[in-house]
Curated annotation (Swiss-Prot):
Enzyme Commission (EC) number: 2.7.7.4
Name the record gives this protein: Sulfate adenylyltransferase subunit 2
Superkingdom of the source species: Bacteria
Protein family according to the UniProt entry: Belongs to the PAPS reductase family. CysD subfamily.
GO molecular function: ATP binding; sulfate adenylyltransferase (ATP) activity
Entry annotated with the keyword Nuclease: no
NCBIfam families according to UniProt: CysD, PRK05253.1, PRK12563.1
InterPro entries recorded: PAPS_reduct_dom, Rossmann-like_a/b/a_fold, SO4_adenylTrfase_ssu, Sulfate_adenylyltrnsfr_sub2
Pfam annotation, one family: PAPS_reduct
Listed pathway(s): Sulfur metabolism; hydrogen sulfide biosynthesis; sulfite from sulfate: step 1/3
């Protein structure tokens, strides 16, 4: 009898599904953080498969900074409605009404108030004790050293020097009241794995990932798409049309595009075979201070 072997992608899928089911079994009130990006889309599909044909026993939550690409918000609402997800959308409306934004306050203040503080408020509001995130270890060095079950204290802070041992597939889910765990079920996936799985499973994604002629400006070395009329007047005469796509998605003034002709999944996979830079190199927030991502994660960022 021929020995049955899982493919590389199916092994990753099995590991992720095991992690998702473990969280559902161990925690009282988990939530899946949904950024609308490719990694979130894969994570959502894994959750759907983990509990099929039943309903996923936890909600999706999107922290809306009010500066996401219009296509992202449209995709979010259509996907949640079509697939019957319980979608929670939270924003820091106080900061938004005060005019906080990336152009007026800079990436650091904007990210802290509109993303980190909004997230922490939402976690406290709904009393979630576990939150799934779509981070991967190959993205960035601070994420590379974080556990799959990442402990957070009662202030939602992460201490990279005080992480719990994590042996094989044994995860420590013990928390006291007020503490929580951030869970990263696709930690061991690479960007190429993500794209190959999207192709394998035919997972719908935001069209911004595909190359297309788009109105962009060059802002401090980043190709920024002019997504709405909040682009400051001083930049508007710099707008030009370029064939670009996005490798990662976030707030449009803080997310750089890459020049590319990859307009299909197959072309994106082929492009990923030869790329040598992480997709996080196009995210402005990762470079707004020394050790930027680790500091943000210590403060409670995704």
């Amino acid at each position: 009898m021929e020995e049955y072997k899982l493919s590389h992608l199916k092994e990753l899928e099995a590991e992720s599904i095991h992690i998702i089911r473990e969280v559902a079994a161990e925690f009282e009130n988990p939530v899946m953080l949904y950024s609308i990006g490719k990694d979130s889309s894969v994570m959502v599909r894994l959750a759907e498969k983990a509990f099929y044909p039943g309903k996923v026993p936890f909600p999706l939550m999107h922290i809306d900074s009010k500066w996401k690409f219009k296509e992202m918000i449209q995709f979010r609402d259509e996907y949640a409605k079509k697939h019957g997800w319980n979608l929670i959308v939270e924003s820091n409306m106080e900061a938004f009404h005060a005019g906080v934004g990336p152009f007026t306050h800079g990436s650091k203040v904007h990210t802290d108030l509109m993303k980190t503080q909004a997230l922490l408020h939402a976690l406290d509001k709904y009393k979630f004790d576990a939150a799934f995130g779509g981070a991967r270890r190959d993205e960035e060095k601070s994420r590379a050293k974080e556990r799959i079950f990442s402990f957070r204290d009662k202030f939602h802070q992460w201490d990279p020097k005080n992480q719990r041992p994590e042996l094989w597939d044994i995860y420590n889910a013990r928390v006291h009241k007020g503490e929580s765990i951030r869970v990263f079920p696709i930690s061991n996936w690479t960007e190429l794995d993500i794209w190959q799985y999207i192709r394998l499973e035919n997972i719908p994604i935001v069209p911004l990932y595909y190359a297309k002629e788009r109105p962009v400006i060059n802002l401090d070395g980043n190709i920024i798409m002019a997504d709405d009329d909040r682009l400051p007047e001083k930049y508007r005469d710099q707008i030009e049309m370029k064939m670009v796509r996005f490798r990662t998605l976030g707030c449009w003034p803080l997310t750089g595009a890459v020049e590319s002709g990859a307009a299909t999944i197959e072309e994106i996979v082929e492009e990923m075979m030869t790329t040598t830079k992480s997709e996080r190199t196009t995210r402005v927030i990762d470079f707004d201070q020394e050790g930027s991502m680790e500091q943000k994660k210590r403060e409670g960022y995704f």
